[in-house]
């Protein structure tokens, strides 16, 4: 699909890059010539990911801590600047909102919103000071603009990231720093998937409500991320690209649900009644 050197020698930091979509993106970046740098909170997970990647620079970092983020970026910059940042680290769970404690809210906002801001602003300051061309890609969700029940802290955080992306795209675009976002639909990952889809019948429901009838494959998102991190997307700035098989569009249409409820007999009855 892409030339083998699409991301040649680009140094790209992927937060939460030890598992899930973060790892899948880091792996694809490396296949396309990039030098991936991954960070996370668990040394053993990072070591295993680096081994699977055939070698990668790793940093143990709790991105909720601005001092830790700054120290990590200082360490990374000792061997040269980054060329890109992928804000992927996240935390989420389903809950009735009235049961959420302040600690539960802060747990999500700290990782998703604050951590993303700390990493983006920290990289941005260094790039702008040096006049270094760079790209930021943030992983959001389709409910960043629609909202969603039962994941309110996540919806708040992702909406904030999208606002940051669009704002800084304007502020920094003229200084060679682009910012974009990807809004994924369902992409199963171990751990996170079980927390968000706790009942087997919910998996079937998710697949049925998707126009393509399936969840996304990690390589599909990783390929999109690779394009947005590459120089081929140099004129794409301040955008959010949805990759969900049309799921949110189906949910938004007033009568989209009808196709799942009507039988052939129902349609025949409508035609016989004069509907066109």
Model regions and ranges:
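C-terminal substrate-recognition "lid" of short-chain dehydrogenase/reductases
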Residues: 214-243, 248
């Amino acid at each position: 699909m892409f030339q083998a050197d699409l991301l040649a020698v680009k140094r790209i930091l992927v937060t939460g890059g030890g598992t899930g979509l973060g790892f899948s993106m880091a792996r694809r970046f490396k296949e396309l010539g990039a030098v991936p740098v991954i960070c996370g909170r668990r040394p053993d997970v990072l070591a295993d990911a680096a081994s699977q990647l055939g070698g990668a620079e790793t940093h143990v970092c709790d991105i909720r801590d601005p001092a830790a983020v700054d120290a990590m970026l200082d360490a990374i910059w000792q061997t040269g600047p980054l060329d890109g940042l992928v804000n992927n680290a996240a935390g989420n769970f389903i809950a009735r909102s009235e049961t959420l404690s302040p600690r539960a809210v802060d747990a999500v906002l700290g990782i998703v919103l604050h951590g993303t801001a700390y990493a983006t602003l920290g990289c941005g300051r260094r790039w702008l000071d040096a006049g270094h061309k760079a790209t930021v890609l943030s992983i959001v969700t389709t409910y960043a603009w629609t909202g969603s029940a039962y994941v309110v802290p996540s919806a708040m955080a992702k909406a904030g990231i999208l606002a940051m992306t669009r704002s800084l795209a304007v502020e920094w675009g003229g200084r060679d720093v682009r910012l974009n976002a990807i809004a994924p639909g369902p992409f199963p990952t171990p751990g996170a998937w079980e927390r968000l889809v706790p009942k087997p019948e919910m998996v079937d429901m998710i697949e049925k409500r998707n126009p393509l009838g399936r969840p996304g494959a990690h390589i599909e998102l990783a390929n999109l991320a690779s394009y947005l991190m590459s120089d081929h997307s140099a004129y794409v700035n301040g955008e959010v690209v949805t990759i969900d098989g049309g799921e949110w569009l189906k949910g938004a249409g007033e009568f989209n649900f009808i196709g799942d409820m009507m039988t052939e007999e129902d349609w025949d009855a409508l035609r016989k009644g004069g509907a066109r």
